[in-house]
Structures are given as C-alpha cells and as structure tokens.
UniProtKB/Swiss-Prot annotation:
One of its GO terms (molecular function) is ubiquitin-like ligase-substrate adaptor activity. The modification S-nitrosocysteine is found at C151. Belongs to the KEAP1 family. Substrate-specific adapter of a BCR (BTB-CUL3-RBX1) E3 ubiquitin ligase complex that regulates the response to oxidative stress by targeting NFE2L2/NRF2 for ubiquitination. KEAP1 acts as a key sensor of oxidative and electrophilic stress: in normal conditions, the BCR(KEAP1) complex mediates ubiquitination and degradation of NFE2L2/NRF2, a transcription factor regulating expression of many cytoprotective genes. It comes from Rattus norvegicus. Kelch repeats lie at residues 327-372, 373-423, 424-470, 471-517, 519-564, 565-611. This is Kelch-like ECH-associated protein 1. The gene is Keap1. The lineage of its organism: Eukaryota, Metazoa, Chordata, Craniata, Vertebrata.
C-alpha cells in the first residue's frame, strides 16, 4: 500500500481551504473545528500525515426524520405489522425492520435471529392494542411519544412487552406523579403484574406512607385477606396509632362480612394488638359486633387486655416507622442563657438539620413524642433579663416544620421528666422557683387537656423518667435537700406510686431511658461530682447492675434510643458545657464518640421521631 502523499499548500478543492488554512504547522495537539452543523478534528498520524474526522451532529435525527417520511408515504418499507387485539378489527402498519429492531430488543430478535418473521413481509401481532402499537412505532422513528392518562397503562404494558425501556420509564414517572389514595393499590398491582419493579416499589411506599387515607378507598376493600395481612404486617406503615390498623381491618371485614368473618383472627394476629391501649381494647370488646360474634377473637383480645393491665413483660412490639427515617431531635438547652434551637441528628449519615426554633428559649425541658409529633414540656427561660419557669407545652410537626402551642401545664415545671403511656404525656416533678414538685399531671392530646394524677412519694427535680410495660418510672433527682438514688413506679390503672429498688449511685440530672426491657440511668450529679457511670435496672430481678461507663462525666444530659443503641448528648461536666455525643452498643458493652452538637449545651429536651419534610424546610429557608 502506498503511503498517503503529504499535503503541500492548499488542497485542490477550494471548499476545504478554510479548514486547511487554519491548521497549525508542525506535529502539535489535535485541533477541533466546529460549526452548528458539524465538527472536524485534525490529528497527526504516526507517519507524520494529518487526518481529520468529520461529524454531522444532527445526522441521526435528520436520517430518522427522512425514514419516518418514507414510512408515512409507504416507501422502502419491508414489513407490515398486522395488529389484532381482542374484538377490535385488525390494523396494519407499514415500517422498516431496521428501525423497529433499533428501538426494541423484541423486534431485533424477531427480525435477526433466524425466526420465521425474519423473511416475512406481513407479521401478525396479538395482545397489544393497535393504538398502542401505532404510538410505539412512532416513537421508534421520532423518539417522542405523547400519552394521555386514560391510556398510559396500555402504553406502558406494550412498552414492557417490547422492552422499550425509555417508554417504560417515562410512563412509570408519569404514574408516580399521579399516585393518590384512590389509585395507589391499583397502580401497585398493575406494576407487579407487568414486572415493573421500580413503579411497584414507589406505589407500595405511597400506600405505606398514606395508609390512613388509602384504607378508606374502594381499592382497599377489594384486597384479598392475604394482601391485607401482608400490608398491615409492615414495620414502615405510617399510622399515628395502632388503632388505625385495627379499624381498617374491621372495616374490611364489614365490607363483605359473610365471606370475610372467617379471616378476623388471622388479621388480628397481624395487628400489633399489644400496642393498643387497654381503654381501646375494652371499648372494642364491649361494642364491636364482629368481635362479639367470634369467641376465639374475643378471648385473644381479652388475654392481651389482661397482659397490658397487669403490666406483664411481653415481647417488644416492633415500632411502626415510615421509611422517611427517624432522627434524634434536640430542643432548647442552656449555654450562658437558655436556647431556642431545634436540631435533628441523623445517625445513619452523621448529619445535623437546623429546624424551626422554639417560640420561647427554654432549658430544663422534657421532650416526648406522640403520634409522630414532638412535644416540648415545661422548662425555664434563663435570660439576661431574668429567669422564668415555664408551664408551656408546645408541639412540633415534622411535616410542616412548625411549632404550635398547646394547653399549659397546671404549674410551671423546670427540670421535670416526661413519659408517654397509651398516647398520654406525663409531666413528672420539676420545680417552680423554690418549690420542688412531687405532683404529676397527664396530658390528653385529643382533648388538649391536662389532669393531675397521684403525686410521687418523693419530691423530685432533675428526675429521670422512663416507661416500660406501661409503667412510669421516676429515677433519682433532688428533693430540695438531698440528691437521690431512690426510684419509684406509677401504676396507671391504680393511680398509685410504689417504691422500687434504689440505684447503686445517687444521681440527679441523669439521663434515663429504656433499652431491651431494661431501664438505664447514665451520668448525673451526686452532690460532689458529675458522673460517667451507667447502671441498668432489670424489672424481672428488680436489681441495678453497672455497665460500661461513658467516656465523659456529664449531668443534665440528653438521652435517646435509636435502632437498638443509646445516645447521650451534651450536658455539663463540672467545668464545661459539652458538645460531645456518645453512643452505647449493648452487644459489646462499649461507648464511642460519634459526633458533636453544633455547640456545647446542657438541659436539652431530646426525643426520636420521623425525619422532617425537606420541602418545607427548603421553602422556609428560602429568602427569595
């Protein structure tokens, strides 16, 4: 082969003159020339000759446009698709095999793998509506499709049949945008039938997140008993309380009672009945006609009612937690003065979110969660202008990123404890000025009312509070004279307190929580030193046992349990307001530092609930 002659001077063709005249001399870097229609690249070859590559950028679009014109005018077509669907008259569409094969793996296999259709001029197609096939053929030529909501399911089904993934994704995205309580189950079932995993998952997630609304729709009542049992068994079902799930099951049975009454017992075992309140169970046992007609179901619920009211230890009921994630919230706190911060920590990625501030700065407050809502109870506003003990109860909604005021406590309570039984908040002890409370009051969110219950046997401020087996435990604190190691337990059915085994260590301002059916007391102040020791109470043996100590001494700390681990946040070590956050792993009996607060502080209110709505946060932070 003869080598290409080296160009000398300008090429003979004058149309290349602008290109060649701009080529720099010597063997340098590649030079790119581009226009709106094409681009050319000049590069040196190994033998010193220059070559160029030329690309017409819109050639493919133009070529397919011409092929579409040929299709519409029935020129150069090499196949006719004869499409028959149910009782609809067959329709014929002329096309080019190469174009169909380029857009659909099914057509490619049909026309290239030696199948009988490869040599056929007329190919019969069944199982797809002619209008759908017409649109898919148009898409093969134009890369564009327009689908109305009434026929999107048919188009998506056809795109799945012919493996046109881009159309499947477009239809899936459209259907996700159309999800609402009335159609989510139908879309989920359709996606499962055609094997569209992503759409099926998105529709199921919508059902879980909007269960309360979905359970009122016709599609819900058309579920089979197996489908319903599977649905209500989900941990990520988003409900305010388990009674929503119970009512949904009873309503489903009532929809066709003669046929469905046989499934009541199986459904009740999928409901987390131990998460129902005794009062609710008692009402249903007395008034629900479905239960009255089924002795086995009635006996089953009576047994659960007795276990709850007798406070028997039961297997831990898995918490319903939507997959939006659960974060550790810290409200208020103290550093030189009371703070109004509300922040949330995500242990899964170590990030912090700054959320809507408390309406009034507070420290020494309690944090509680009912129905996914975060409540800030009592506290004190320490400010340069003076100190004011608070009787306020404020409610934070993660979905709106907003606080709203609720009914006030009967008395101000600084450094009180808070716990939740049967959806009711208990505010325990605390102080108002020099008055140290033994009183306890209960808040009913549905009525927005506080009511006093039996007082503790001991006055306590800086008291740690925990709830286990529907019993309220008050641990340690300060009675106005002495720091305490005593602890007592409240029985709501009897409305009375009883002393339990005292702790091994005097602790005021300790962090108290429940993990794996044990009560943990971490840190605190014994009257001389801040503590880093931790002990736990076994309700079965009624004994306190030391576990591994924290890395830092701390009192007035925040504490929370998240995914089987204990987190302690901030506090005071006797010299410094801490910003450290430690995590306890019960499997290894070890503490580790995992993150830091955005600033040191003590006396924070801490609780765990769902992740806030990012859209609301972004909108409220927007200064546009």
């Amino acid at each position: 082969m003869q080598p290409e002659p080296k160009p000398s001077g300008a090429p003979r063709s004058s149309q290349f003159l602008p290109l060649w005249s701009k080529c720099p001399e010597g063997a340098g870097d590649a030079v790119m020339y581009a226009s709106t229609e094409c681009k050319a690249e000049v590069t040196p070859s190994q033998d010193g000759n220059r070559t160029f590559s030329y690309t017409l950028e819109d050639h493919t679009k133009q070529a397919f446009g011409i092929m579409n014109e040929l299709r519409l005018s029935q020129q150069l077509c090499d196949v006719t698709l004869q499409v028959k669907y149910e009782d609809i008259p067959a329709a014929q569409f002329m096309a080019h095999k190469v174009v169909l094969a380029s857009s659909s793996p099914v057509f490619k296999a049909m026309f290239t793998n030696g199948l009988r259709e490869q040599g056929m001029e007329v190919v019969s197609i069944e199982g797809i509506h002619p209008k759908v096939m017409e649109r898919l053929i148009e898409f093969a030529y134009t890369a564009s499709i327009s689908v109305g909501e009434k026929c999107v399911l048919h188009v998506m089904n056809g795109a799945v049949m012919y493996q046109i993934d881009s159309v499947v994704r477009a239809c899936s995205d459209f259907l996700v945008q159309q999800l609402d309580p009335s159609n989510a189950i139908g879309i989920a079932n359709f996606a499962e039938q055609i094997g569209c995993t992503e759409l099926h998952q998105r529709a199921r997630e919508y059902i879980y997140m909007h269960f309360g609304e979905v359970a009122k729709q016709e599609e819900f009542f058309n579920l089979s008993h197996c489908q319903l049992a599977t649905l209500i068994s989900r941990d990520d079902l988003n409900v305010r309380c388990e009674s929503e799930v119970f009512h949904a099951c009873i309503d489903w049975v009532k929809y066709d009672c003669p046929q469905r009454r046989f499934y009541v017992q199986a459904l009740l075992r999928a409901v987390r009945c131990h998460a129902l309140t005794p009062r609710f169970l008692q009402t249903q046992l007395q008034k629900c006609e479905i239960l009255q007609a089924d002795a086995r179901c009635k006996d089953y619920l009576v047994q659960i009612f007795q276990e709850l009211t007798l406070h028997k230890p039961t297997q831990a009921v898995p918490c319903r937690a939507p997959k939006v994630g659960r974060l550790i919230y810290t409200a208020g706190g103290y550093f030189r003065q009371s703070l109004s911060y509300l922040e949330a920590y995500n242990p899964s990625n170590g990030s912090w979110l700054r959320l809507a501030d408390l309406q009034v700065p507070r420290s020494g407050l309690a944090g509680c969660v009912v129905g996914g809502l975060l409540y800030a109870v009592g506290g004190r506003n320490n400010s340069p202008d003076g100190n004011t003990d608070s009787s306020a109860l404020d409610c934070y909604n993660p979905m709106t990123n907003q606080w709203s005021p609720c009914a006030s406590l009967s008395v101000p309570r600084n450094r009180s404890g808070g716990g939740v039984i049967d959806g009711h908040i208990y505010a325990v002890g605390g102080s108002h000025g020099c008055i140290h409370h033994s009183s306890v009051e209960r808040y009913e969110p549905d009525r927005d009312e506080w009511h006093l219950v039996a007082p503790m046997l001991t006055r306590r401020i800086g008291v740690g509070v925990a709830v286990l087996n529907r019993l309220l435990y008050a641990v340690g604190g300060f009675d106005g004279t002495n720091r305490l190691n005593s602890a007592e337990c409240y029985y709501p059915e009897r409305n009375e307190w009883r002393m339990i085994t005292p702790m091994n260590t005097i602790r005021s301002g300790a962090g108290v929580c429940v993990l794996h059916s044990c009560i943990y007391a971490a840190g605190g102040y014994d009257g001389q030193d801040q503590l880093n020791s931790v002990e736990r109470y076994d309700v079965e043996t009624e004994t306190w046992t030391f576990v591994a100590s924290m890395k830092h001494r701390r009192s007035a700390l925040g504490i929370a349990v998240h995914q089987g681990r204990i987190y302690v946040l901030g506090g005071y070590d006797g010299h410094t307001f801490l910003d450290s956050v430690e995590c306890y792993d019960p499997d290894t009996d070890t503490w580790s530092e995992v993150t830091r607060l955005t600033s040191g502080r003590s006396g924070v209110g801490v609780a765990v609930t769902m992740e806030p709505c990012r859209k609301q946060i972004d909108q409220q932070n927007c200064t546009c």
